[in-house]
């Protein structure tokens, strides 16, 4: 069985190859690893070298950037940006319209409210139940 790829140009003029994920039909880079049990909404993107674990849900319009890791059972709402090389721990829940910064880390089971910004290099070790800017918890080393 052959796979059909789509080439999309990024902001640097580079072409990346994407295929539609079997669950949800979202765009998944040819070099990313997405578990077959994960669900990627049709308007979501998973960029090169990103990983999405089993049973994860990536909402409509969300963007998982290069090298990011989304753990098993994670729920990511609509229109979320997960930054480059960010880590989202198993079972975490990320509300809609949220930005997770580059290299940020959300530990297992955390809940991040909708409309929240987590800064670059931040480590979130407790849930952020209200919308807003979440910084200063513990800088990544």
Predicted regions and their residues:
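Glycine-rich hexapeptide-repeat left-handed beta-helix
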Residues: 2-27, 72, 77-141
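Alpha-helical adaptor scaffolds
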Residues: 47, 53-54, 59-61, 65-73, ...
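Extended, small-residue-rich solenoid/repeat segments and analogous flexible loops
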Residues: 1-63
């Amino acid at each position: 069985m052959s796979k059909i790829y789509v080439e999309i140009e990024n902001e640097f003029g580079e072409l990346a190859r994407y295929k539609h994920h079997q669950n949800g039909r979202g765009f998944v880079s040819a070099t990313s690893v997405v578990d077959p049990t994960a669900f990627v909404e049709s308007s979501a993107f998973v960029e090169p070298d990103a990983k999405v674990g089993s049973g994860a849900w990536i909402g409509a319009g969300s963007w998982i950037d290069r090298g990011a890791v989304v753990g098993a059972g994670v729920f990511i709402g609509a229109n979320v940006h997960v930054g480059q090389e960010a880590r989202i721990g198993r079972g975490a829940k990320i509300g809609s319209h949220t930005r997770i910064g580059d290299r940020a880390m959300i530990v297992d089971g955390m809940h991040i409210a909708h409309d929240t910004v987590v800064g670059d290099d931040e480590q979130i070790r407790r849930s952020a139940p209200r919308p807003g800017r979440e910084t200063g918890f513990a800088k990544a080393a």
